[in-house]
């Protein structure tokens, strides 16, 4: 049996390698960590979550909830590890960041069909290759990819991560546990602000000194990871209608909704580390400490990691890739993960999943397994390969890329839930063939 080289052991690469190995395909997994790390990585584990620890909404009224359920039913390694290391997060699936990455790493390294070869890859290998090196691909490999693709086929945007702080340093006399509208369990720490406190905070935030990031412009930021200071510049109330919105978060001390609320989400299973929800930033570290200390409950907060910003590179995929994430000009090469233009942890996993199982089928002489566009997995593959998309941008999974129902359903949540049920019904008819090893 021919082997496959998978470059990169992030979410997409780990999932892809696992799916190939499960189907009897020998895999050589190349990963430059721990010998060389990117600016966003901290540990040497595979599948390290560099931004939030949340895999977003869990319900089937959310497109990402549907995508997770599809992957879960099809034996995704990433979803299995995420479920096993989940931490309380209201209606979202959030994980113990280190525990999750450790479990993925141990699973991948323990598979008999996967051989790990550490070290940086500087050229595209011969034979069957899946490039899942991520948006922070090293310069040498990025140059090799650019040479293979020709000029003008790589694009970029900027991404940011939020700070991580310790629970013990949060002033709980000025904060309270609650979930929005009391849905689920009260898993979030809520840090309320009065009008005067918020206005003073906003005034300092918009003029705080930013770290230098070569080539950064506000217009080059992905909306889903907009730095909090960039969002604040859009207007004094922008944050209050965004990540700091107080709706449904009644302060038990006053019996009223605060003027603004900063939410903290648990980042590990022990509940000793929390991240500032929506506080992606590229302020200088000293400025982060100064400005964020103006939030009453965080006046003495201790940070384990300050927010950082980095450039993300992705492909002009509609011109380059087919629906299986293969290079149209050279099908022995496939890509997976955020560099294909899918945005988000779960979306990256899905691309690695599909690239892996389709490559395994090709190597076994089997026909491609076409996931229809009614499924979230299929819709993502068709989005990144749709040549009619002129201005290709990274995108999260959403119901807009899935065909509508053939009948009217009252209410958006009900409609989305029915779209999900249709997708899962289709998926269940394919399940046996997908899982055949």
Residue ranges and their predicted role:
Residues 97-116:
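Helical element adjacent to the flavin cofactor pocket in flavoenzyme catalytic cores
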Residues 48-59, 83-99:
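Dinucleotide-binding Rossmann-like beta1-alpha1 core, especially the glycine-rich loop
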């Amino acid at each position: 049996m021919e082997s496959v080289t998978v470059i990169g052991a992030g979410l997409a690469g780990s999932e892809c390698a696992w799916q190939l190995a499960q189907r009897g395909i020998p895999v050589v997994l190349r990963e430059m960590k721990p010998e060389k790390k990117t600016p966003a990585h901290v540990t040497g584990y595979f599948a390290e979550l560099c931004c939030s620890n949340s895999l977003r909404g869990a319900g089937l009224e959310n497109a990402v909830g549907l995508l997770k359920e599809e992957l879960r039913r099809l034996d995704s390694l990433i979803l299995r590890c995420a479920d096993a290391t989940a931490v309380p997060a209201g209606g979202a699936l959030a994980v113990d960041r280190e525990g999750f990455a450790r479990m993925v790493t141990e699973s991948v390294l323990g598979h008999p069909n996967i051989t790990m070869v550490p070290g940086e890859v500087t050229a595209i290998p011969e034979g069957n290759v899946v490039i899942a090196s991520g948006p922070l691909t090293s310069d040498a490999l990025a140059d090799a990819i650019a040479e293979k693709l020709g000029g003008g086929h790589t694009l970029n945007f900027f991404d940011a991560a939020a700070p991580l702080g310790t629970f013990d340093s949060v002033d709980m006399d000025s904060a309270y546990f609650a979930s929005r509208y009391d849905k689920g369990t009260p898993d979030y720490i809520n840090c309320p602000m009065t009008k005067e406190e918020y206005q003073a905070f906003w005034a300092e935030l918009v003029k705080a000194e930013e770290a230098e990031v070569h080539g950064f412009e506000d217009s080059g930021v992905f909306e889903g990871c907009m730095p909090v200071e960039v969002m604040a510049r859009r207007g004094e109330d922008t944050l209050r209608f965004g990540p700091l919105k107080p709706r449904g978060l009644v302060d038990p001390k006053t019996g009223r909704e605060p003027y603004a609320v900063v939410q903290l989400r648990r980042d590990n299973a022990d509940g000793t580390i929390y991240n500032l929800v929506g506080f992606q930033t590229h302020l200088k570290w000293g400025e982060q400490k100064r400005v964020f200390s103006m939030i009453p409950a965080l006046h003495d907060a201790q940070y384990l990691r300050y927010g950082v910003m980095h450039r993300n590179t992705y492909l002009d995929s509609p011109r380059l890739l087919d629906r299986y994430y293969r290079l149209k000009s050279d099908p022995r090469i496939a890509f997976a993960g955020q560099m294909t233009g899918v945005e988000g942890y779960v979306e990256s996993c899905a691309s690695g999943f599909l690239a892996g199982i389709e490559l395994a089928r090709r190597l076994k002489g089997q026909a491609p397994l076409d996931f229809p566009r009614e499924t979230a997995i299929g819709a993502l593959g068709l989005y990144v390969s749709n040549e009619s998309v002129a201005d290709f941008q990274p995108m999260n999974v959403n119901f807009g890329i899935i065909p509508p129902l053939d009948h009217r359903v009252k209410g958006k949540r009900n409609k989305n839930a029915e779209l999900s049920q249709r997708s899962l019904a289709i998926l269940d008819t394919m399940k046996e063939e997908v899982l055949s090893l």
